[in-house]
Structures are given as C-alpha cells and as structure tokens.
Amino acid sequence: MQIDIIAPGRVKERYLRDAIDEYSKRLSRYCKLNIIEVADEKTPDHASEGVDRQIKAREGERIAKHLKDGAFVIALAINGKQLSSEELAAKINDLGLRGTSHIQLVIGGSIGLDDAILRRADFLLSFSKMTFPHQLMRVILLEQIYRAYKINAGEPYHK
C-alpha cells in the first residue's frame, strides 16, 4: 500500500520533524510512505473572507497537482467523520481488500482546505471538532496510521 500525506508548508520545529521521522521509519515496515509538502501562502492577520478564499484556492491548486487518479483521497476536515483508531484501521484494511493500493491523505494549511479539494475527496476525516496546528497534525496523523497498521497486524501497541 502506498500512503501519501499531502500538506502545505514545511515543518520547521525540530521536535516535530523528529517525530515525523520516527513514525516514517516505523511505518516503512507496513507501507510505502510519501510526504509531499506544497508551498504554503502567508495569511495576513485579520484577512477578509475573500482573501482567505484566494489563499485556500492557491494552496488547493498546488495540492490538486499531486492527487492521483485511482488513489483513494482522504481530506482532513473539521466537519468530516470522526473514527476511532480501530475504525480507521478497519477502513485502511477494507480499502486494501477492495483493491485500493494508494491512499492520499490531505491536510489543509492554517486556514483549512479549499472546497475543490473537499469535493474531490472520497472521504472526509475529522480528528476532533477542535482545530490543531497543521504541522502538529502531521505527527498525529502519522501516529494514527502507524497504530492502524499495528492493529491490523494484530501486534501490541500501547494505548
């Protein structure tokens, strides 16, 4: 299974990069992981809704260039479906059983994802009604993917 994580911006904080590297290494036993960083846009303080839409559209265009035909696209969205770790594991397992060999997970930038990306997604996933920093979300997402593979393999993993 190939798993792509697509997100705007670079992770700058060393501790987050270290965590991303650790989970990437752990996941290498289970899947082919590809982290795709697209250029992000600077969001001015107190930007109007129109400016926010333009920023999301530009980031969305960059993200869309990496979405592959035949891939199952999961967009992280606050209004998406919340799953337990076991349910996410079952979803990944079910996709594999149905012949899906490529999953792309998309994380939005600091103001979220463009509507075009949300419409293109095959599934909207929410981790919470709360908002998380998009750089931290990469670590959380990687940990949950790793946990899903451990669950599917019947291997122990701390709770």
UniProtKB/Swiss-Prot annotation:
Catalytic activity: pseudouridine(1915) in 23S rRNA + S-adenosyl-L-methionine = N(3)-methylpseudouridine(1915) in 23S rRNA + S-adenosyl-L-homocysteine + H(+)
Name of the protein in its database record: Ribosomal RNA large subunit methyltransferase H
Keywords per UniProt: Cytoplasm, Methyltransferase, rRNA processing, S-adenosyl-L-methionine, Transferase
InterPro entries: Alpha/beta_knot_MTases, RlmH-like, tRNA_m1G_MTases_N
The protein's assembly and partners: Homodimer.
Gene Ontology molecular function, alphabetical: rRNA (pseudouridine-N3-)-methyltransferase activity
Lineage summary: Bacteria, Bacillati, Actinomycetota, Actinomycetes, Bifidobacteriales
Keyword presence, rRNA processing: yes
Binding-site positions, S-adenosyl-L-methionine: L76, G108, F127, S128, K129, M130, T131, F132
SUPFAM superfamilies with a match to the protein in the record: alpha/beta knot
Organism this protein belongs to: Bifidobacterium longum (strain NCC 2705)
